[in-house]
């Protein structure tokens, strides 16, 4: 049995479970996203990239990750 406590969040419109204590930087790491190529909206507000490691996710948070893609 898995004793690690988890919380539910909404990520890009889909429900996900993550470990308690994860911050935005941790979330990007497990999703294998480059911090320099994304913007994160948390509960309707754009999160400050400089504070990703200080913004901890809470139960029922709504997270939207937008990835920048270059083109021509």
Regions found by a protein language model. Name each.
Residues 1-71:
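Ubiquitin-like/PB1-type beta-grasp interaction modules and other compact soluble beta-rich domains
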């Amino acid at each position: 049995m898995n004793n690690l406590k988890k919380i539910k969040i909404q990520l890009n419109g889909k429900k996900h479970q993550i470990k308690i204590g994860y911050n935005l930087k941790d979330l990007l790491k497990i999703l294998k996203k480059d911090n320099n190529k994304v913007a994160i909206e948390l509960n309707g507000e754009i999160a400050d990239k400089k504070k990703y490691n200080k913004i901890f996710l809470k139960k029922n948070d709504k997270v939207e990750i937008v990835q920048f893609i270059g083109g021509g």
